[in-house]
Amino acid sequence: ACQASQLAVCASAILSGAKPSGECCGNLRAQQPCFCQYAKDPTYGQYIRSPHARDTLQSCGLAVPHC
């Protein structure tokens, strides 16, 4: 199930470009199928589409989704 709240541990990485934690990467991996849904969400979309979000995904070894 998609739970955007699980991405809260990634907030500092997504907002400031800080190195993501292991917990952040694990949660991103689990939520990966939901990224496009989040990108379209008015609340979360601006964060998911930000350059730092891309960097965070790449730091975790995850592909940046093409929605």
Swiss-Prot record:
Signal peptide: none annotated. GO terms for molecular function: lipid binding. One of its GO terms (biological process) is lipid transport. Keywords: Disulfide bond, Lipid transport, Lipid-binding, Transport. Disulfide bonds join C2-C34, C10-C24, C25-C60, C36-C67. Coiled coil: none annotated. Pfam families: Tryp_alpha_amyl. SUPFAM superfamilies: Bifunctional inhibitor/lipid-transfer protein/seed storage 2S albumin. Gene3D superfamilies: Plant lipid-transfer and hydrophobic proteins. Belongs to the plant LTP family. B11E subfamily. Transfer lipids across membranes. May play a role in plant defense or in the biosynthesis of cuticle layers. This is Non-specific lipid-transfer protein 2P. It comes from Triticum aestivum.
